[in-house]
């Protein structure tokens, strides 16, 4: 029933077997009720803390750098580090999902100085890619990438469980001090399963 709560089964005959197993189960199972409460409020970016139910999400930034050997590498960016106009930046959204879920939306706001290297919306994902961290492999789920003026939205019909990574490349186009809302992920089929990252601070850019 947990899977039924977060997945669209459609006309799969397995639904009948699952329903029968519940109806013939113990009385305490039949007495189970689920209540979902939602609260919306406003708070300054700086006070937003990481939170989640069934999901976790983190955003990490990396700058493309060229080593002495001429090979391109990635340097992780931490709060307080200055970036320059023209720098190529990769945003990496690291997601953990407790269960396979249907109809999931990832919303990734961006600072005004960031311009996506690929500004066209379209299909996204379903490849294996090596992470720079510890050389492990990560699955990139398949979905649709919708590029908007201030954010990128990712829509997934099915989102796999466990650890996945979504990435996006940007170029720095303006100098100044910039900030943006936190990245969020949510199951549209069961909205009480969601997560947001903590506020990561301002981004400073120079010419």
Each model region followed by its residue ranges:
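Long, domain-scale non-catalytic interaction/scaffolding regions in large secretory-pathway
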Residues: 1-207
